[in-house]
């Protein structure tokens, strides 16, 4: 048996394998598991060989699915360009990256032949990316006077971990950070019951970050259609403050905490992300209870512990907040609303508070602006709309506190 396996391993397949040799389906299946050429997938996509691709795509490494051909395009580009709906779905399901640009500087979404194809690229069953529908305290800390001082303290502490003026070479430091994340954080995803292809795709993003010494790959991982952003934000909300606590807690995994600080340091202090700094307005949807609303008084200050996905398009936030769906909101037995659809308008004034990531996002149509942790905003306006109009019920405006 071992002899036969070694014999099969020694066979080098050409792009077009001899038909007689591969007439045996079992042998062909074994060979596909051992050697596979990206150009085969690209050619099969161009020919729309969906059934053939279904037979082997689960065995194709993510790096080969996202291989850039000599003409500058990926398999996803060619499938979208020719309008092959089922094939686009299959590639996306198996880890095709949406953000790769070809030699024309276009993503597969931008080259899509039809509006139907473009719809496939949009997120589905991911209603809380631009929507805060969990416990507000899970995401925000509300303080009256000291919020901005805490923000300054937290960010200065981060500089000690990921300093711009560090004498250590940036690429060396990035390797150290990546290795720590890989060893102590990415491995946790095995406990999250993620689909295998999601795990492989997340690992692919971080592998590229390490190879290229480029933190943009970590941003891409966050924007991907995996559950990476949900898990990271949950951990940030639960544990990131432990890093700043003066006493140790034996129940806390400080390797996890240090990895979370690495993530925040990369997003805030990495020179590689400076070109993405954003100043301006952005929008996010929220589902709020009466108790939540009562905390957002004019003049109150809030500081976020997590990464917040917002959009330059107000309509995106309105859709996620349930605009026009008030009749479907959670209600009491006597038909009084429990959840109120809310749209927050954030005015970002300082650098290193938000990143404009829509050009590198896996879903460019969302025009995503990412608000970074330890950012402080003051509530400047609250408007309550007529519930009979079945629109957004609460409109909040928040303006970032000035840097000292």
Where are these regions (language model features)?
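Mono-ADP-ribosyltransferase
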Residues: 2-34, 38, 42, 55, ...
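Residue-level marker of regulatory loop/turn positions in helix-turn-helix DNA-binding domains and
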Residues: 33, 45, 68
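Ankyrin-repeat inter-repeat connecting loop/turn
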Residues: 63-65, 98
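Charged, surface-exposed interaction regions in soluble eukaryotic proteins
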Residues: 66, 71-73, 77-85
